[in-house]
Amino acid sequence: MSEENNHKEKSKNEIKKEKKKIEKEKKITELKSKKKINEKNNTINYDDDDDNDDDNFKNKKWGEINNENYKEIIKNRFVKEWSNISDLNESCVGKYVLIRARVSNIRSFGNSLCFLQLRDGLSSIQAVISKNDENNSKSMIHFINSTITKESIIDIEAILTNSSTPIESCIIKNLELKIYSLFLQSKSNSSLPLQFDDLSKPTTYQNYDDNGYTYVIPLNSRLNNRCLDLRTFYNLSIFKIQSAISNLFRDQLLINDFIEIHSPKIIKQSINENSFKLNYFNEIAYLSESTQFYRQLAIVSDFKRVFEIGPVYRTDLGHTHRHLNEFTSLDFEMTFKDHYHEVLDFLDNLMISIFKILETNYENELKIINNYQLQFEKFKFSTKTPRFTFSEVKLMLIEFSENENNKFCMELFDYLNVQEERIFGKIVKEKFNVDYYIIEKPSSEYQPFYIMPDSNNEKLLNSFHIYINGEKIGSGSQRIHDWKLLEKRYKNYYINHNNNNNNNNNNNNNNNNNNNNNNIENYINIFKFGCSQHAGCSIGLERLVMAYLGLENIRKASFCPRDPTRLTP
């Protein structure tokens, strides 16, 4: 009898448990049904009351992403496709989007309201979360206030809405995001050596510290914290343009049947005795200062048209605004039929095509740089580039000197110093209203021996320099392809060079001269197998970017610059 009663009580307990289970499943089903999601256009109607979150859902709307929960978080997203902030526009209003962005700023009003300024690429937008929003809770806002820091990276699902007032602190001013879910993807240290807002202010802008004193973030401080400095829209724009220039250079050459080569940067011999030396398996080697020898070797090998984009190394000790010890060189070499101007014309057209595409396709980046630099002037060029001979340049400088009562260039020198280059750039801008021009036919006295002399005047060379805003960004020349003439020119150069340095005739110099003679002999020998007429050019990428954008220092155009005092980062 007792066993029968126990059986009945057990059955009652099982029935109660089963009933509770059914009720719980029903409640869960009801909660799920309240989320009316339209998969087609990513819209959602959420009917829950505020703070009525069930344990099954609360932890899925906010939190930190880790290796254990990220699969579950991905699974529970109702927006499946990622968007960029730059993709958001009026046509997206009312739709839910999934975005990963960096937090630039946080403005919180207790646990009831919070504004996040988010940025991604070259765009930014405001996101808002309020406890009055039926999708949110105080707990979610508390998580943001207690956990999210500036420069952290977050993933959000949010609905795009029109903002009631323009948001001046963001790139997108007329739209904002109302957050539905938020997950911390990567947390930044709360103590930052430099703030994004300070880094984003113009270099001439005087920032105020807590004591009211003005200060400007020095370039060295920026370079010491390069990963923070590079995050600014200004720097991102610079390197997007730098990337575009190198890609356009490559694309245009490939279209014109050039072959890209990759020459060694560790070499056995160096013409310049001041090249960087290194121990190469107990043998002295050098870092390459130029790819010219290998480009000419390719021409001798009948490649006809070659180019290379790569690093070169110089041991310049000067701490100037335009010199680096490692930089990227845009180089090409090509044969021609009758005159080296065929190569110069090709280069000129190449540069003009790059300028045109930058002007058209990178208007936003140029505008950002313009706003940052304050004194930025739009780059100007002509489809008919002004070309000047060296003697014409000197005469124009003398005329300018006389008009300005300035005697800095009253004599005809065989080179242009930095002051003369800048002044001539201003003369060209005033007379021709362009920033880009070419100077050719320099005197042979201070130029390399391998450049072909002018057939009408051996004291002049078939050589040219490219200028932007008074800065020399590159140079090129017709090379001597006749080994006998090359040998003769070298002997004359060698004699003159020794006469100019006759006070340094010690044993070490004699050894260096012997090594240089061996290097030159190896260079001359490749032309004994026959070589086509050819010319080439080298352009410093960082120098080009600096001059084109009007940057005051070449280090701003280098991702991580190397100069005599900097080996990091």
Swiss-Prot record:
Q: What are its GO biological-process terms?
A: aspartyl-tRNA aminoacylation
Q: What is one GO cellular-component annotation here?
A: cytoplasm
Source species, please? Dictyostelium discoideum
The protein's annotated catalytic reaction(s) are: tRNA(Asp) + L-aspartate + ATP = L-aspartyl-tRNA(Asp) + AMP + diphosphate
What molecular function does GO assign, one term? ATP binding
Q: Name one Pfam family in it.
A: tRNA-synt_2
Q: Which Gene3D superfamilies match?
A: Bira Bifunctional Protein, Domain 2 (3.30.930.10), Nucleic acid-binding proteins (2.40.50.140)
Family classification: Belongs to the class-II aminoacyl-tRNA synthetase family. Type 2 subfamily.
The protein's name is Aspartate--tRNA ligase, cytoplasmic 2
